[in-house]
């Protein structure tokens, strides 16, 4: 009798995606982050679902409903801590996943890469609307500052901002719709992730060497299911350490105060995973210019495949590109640090230099590094 997993219409799809899938034999731990992101998404959906059962999206009761979840709901404190820190783990995995894609040239699978960039933008939107829900000081002022950026768009900006707010400022209508968006977006992300996988399985996985691996493939199960399971254990260990020992480590103390439109916090900043983009936004002293730079900092990923000039796909054997890649990584860490600092010297100038270097590295230096490496590899006799 033929194995049911190979004949059943539904099981057959799962079999081709996770069991009998031919995978390169040499993919490293950097290829674990895709499955880790899937686990993060499932954790966030499950904890979020239970939180939504007790949360009320009303300006008068939102803050106290979160306090009620932590104090009165069975394991509510754990659900809230897992959900809040799960978002941080999600973004940590996302950044490492994108970094892996850039380092090993995975962006040359253009459809997979483009869906990935759309996924990144959608996850950022989901995290932003989610951060507003507890209705603390930083939730309210973060929402006010970021949605206000829409008013920088010529002609339609003010109308657009008021349309998003559902009034003349961030208020009850804004909170209610943000809760609705935050509930629906994870399912949209799940659908996009399936499309992302669909495109990936059209071409097969890339590998560290960047060489076509078709001559040496192994089945996904048991080799990579075991490898992924090890990754899951590490992820859950770090998440539980965060959620149980220092749940407020990555949060902002201002969010323990209920939202007050009459009292502005001394320093408005988003969660750590948005700080690099926030630093780029602030480094341009013009509202519209800042908004465009903010968008460009993410959308620049879409043109990375067009900037690939090297004869080799991966950076594994390209030391000049490797050096620039790690400078870019250090630069992003610098931007993250600057985004959390007050707007005063020397932070302003450091932020401006780091923002300029970010775009220069990607648009100019990476491009010429590939051409230079091609030239150096040419036989000189």
Swiss-Prot record:
Spans traversing the lipid bilayer: 33-53, 77-98, 113-133, 178-198, 226-246, 288-308, 320-340, 347-367
GO MF term list: metal ion binding; ubiquinol-cytochrome-c reductase activity
Cofactor: heme b
Keyword Transmembrane: yes
Binding site for a ubiquinone: 201
UniProt-annotated binding residues for heme b b562: 83, 182
GO BP: mitochondrial electron transport, ubiquinol to cytochrome c
Biological function: Component of the ubiquinol-cytochrome c reductase complex (complex III or cytochrome b-c1 complex) that is part of the mitochondrial respiratory chain. The b-c1 complex mediates electron transfer from ubiquinol to cytochrome c. Contributes to the generation of a proton gradient across the mitochondrial membrane that is then used for ATP synthesis.
Stated family: Belongs to the cytochrome b family.
Protein name per the record: Cytochrome b
């Amino acid at each position: 009798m033929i194995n049911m997993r190979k004949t059943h219409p539904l099981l057959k799809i799962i079999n081709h995606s996770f069991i009998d899938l031919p995978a390169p034999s040499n993919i490293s731990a950097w290829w674990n982050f895709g499955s880790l992101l899937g686990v993060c998404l499932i954790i966030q959906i499950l904890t979020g679902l239970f939180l939504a059962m007790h949360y009320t999206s009303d300006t008068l009761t939102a803050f106290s409903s979160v306090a009620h979840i932590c104090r009165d709901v069975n394991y509510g404190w754990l659900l809230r801590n897992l959900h809040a820190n799960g978002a941080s783990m999600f973004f940590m995995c996302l950044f490492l996943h994108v970094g892996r894609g850039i380092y090993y040239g995975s962006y040359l699978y253009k459809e997979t890469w483009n869906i990935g960039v759309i996924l990144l933008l959608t996850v950022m939107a989901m995290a932003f609307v989610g951060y507003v829900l507890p209705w603390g000081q930083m939730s309210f002022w973060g929402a006010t500052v970021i949605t206000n950026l829409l008013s920088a768009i010529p002609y339609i900006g003010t109308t657009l901002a008021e349309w998003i707010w559902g009034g003349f400022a961030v208020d009850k209508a804004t909170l209610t719709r943000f809760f609705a968006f935050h509930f629906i977006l994870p399912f949209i992300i799940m659908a996009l992730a399936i499309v992302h996988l669909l495109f990936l399985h059209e071409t097969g996985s890339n590998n560290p060497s960047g060489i076509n691996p078709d001559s040496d493939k192994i089945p996904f199960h048991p080799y990579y299911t075991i490898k992924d399971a090890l990754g899951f254990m590490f992820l859950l260990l770090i998440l539980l350490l965060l959620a149980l020992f220092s749940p407020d480590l990555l949060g902002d103390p201002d969010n323990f105060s209920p939202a007050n439109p009459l009292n502005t916090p001394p320093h408005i900043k988003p969660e750590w995973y948005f700080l690099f983009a926030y630093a780029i936004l602030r480094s341009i002293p013009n509202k519209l210019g800042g908004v465009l730079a903010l968008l460009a900092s993410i959308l620049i990923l879409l043109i990375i495949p067009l900037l690939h000039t090297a004869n080799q796909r991966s950076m594994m054997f390209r030391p000049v590109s490797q050096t620039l890649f790690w400078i870019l990584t250090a630069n992003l860490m610098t931007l993250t640090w600057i985004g959390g600092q007050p707007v005063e010297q020397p932070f302003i100038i450091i932020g401006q230099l780091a923002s300029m270097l970010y775009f220069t590295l990607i648009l100019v230096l990476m491009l010429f590094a590939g051409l230079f490496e091609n030239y150096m590899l040419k036989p000189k006799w």
